[in-house]
C-alpha cells in the first residue's frame, strides 16, 4: 500500500505534456491585383515570416500561437497575394524545469502546429485561384536556438555558466 502511494506521488512529479486542442485563431487572404494578376506570366517570389507567442492560461495550461505570413509577388513588385494564418493550440505542460519549458513552448509546440498552418495556407491560396503553396518543413529547434543565442548576445537573458 505504501509503495503504491509513493509511486503515485512520484508519477505526479514526472514531466507531463498533453495536447488539449488545436484551433484556427485568425485567417486572412488578400489579392490586391485580381483579376489582372491572372493575365500575367507567373513568375513568383515568396516571402515567409514566422512568429510564435505563448501565454499561460490557468494552472498548467498554455496557449501557443504560430503566425505564418506569406507575401507572394509576381515579378519584381506586383503583389499577387498576401496570406496569413494564426494557428493555435492549448497544451497541458507540467513539471518541467524553466529551460525545458522554454524549449517546449518555443520549439516543440510550434512544430506540432506548423502542419496545420501550412495546410490552412495552402487551402487559402488554392481557393484564391493561385498555384498550390508547398511550404517546406521548418526547423523550429534551430530557430529557437538562434533566438536564444541572439538574446544572450544582447544581454536579454544571461549566458549559462559552466560549473
Curated annotation (Swiss-Prot):
It holds the Pfam family SecB. The keyword Aminoacyl-tRNA synthetase does not apply. Transmembrane segments: none annotated. SUPFAM superfamilies: SecB-like (SSF54611). GO terms for cellular component: cytoplasm. Belongs to the SecB family. GO terms for biological process: protein folding; protein tetramerization; protein transport. It is found in: Cytoplasm. It comes from Pseudomonas aeruginosa (strain ATCC 15692 / DSM 22644 / CIP 104116 / JCM 14847 / LMG 12228 / 1C / PRS 101 / PAO1). GO terms for molecular function: unfolded protein binding. This is Protein-export protein SecB. Its main location: cytoplasm. Homotetramer, a dimer of dimers. One homotetramer interacts with 1 SecA dimer. Keywords: Chaperone, Cytoplasm, Protein transport, Translocation, Transport. It comes from the Bacteria. The keyword Endoplasmic reticulum does not apply. One of the proteins required for the normal export of preproteins out of the cell cytoplasm. It is a molecular chaperone that binds to a subset of precursor proteins, maintaining them in a translocation-competent state. It also specifically binds to its receptor SecA. InterPro entries: SecB, SecB-like_sf. The lineage of its organism: Bacteria, Pseudomonadati, Pseudomonadota, Gammaproteobacteria, Pseudomonadales.
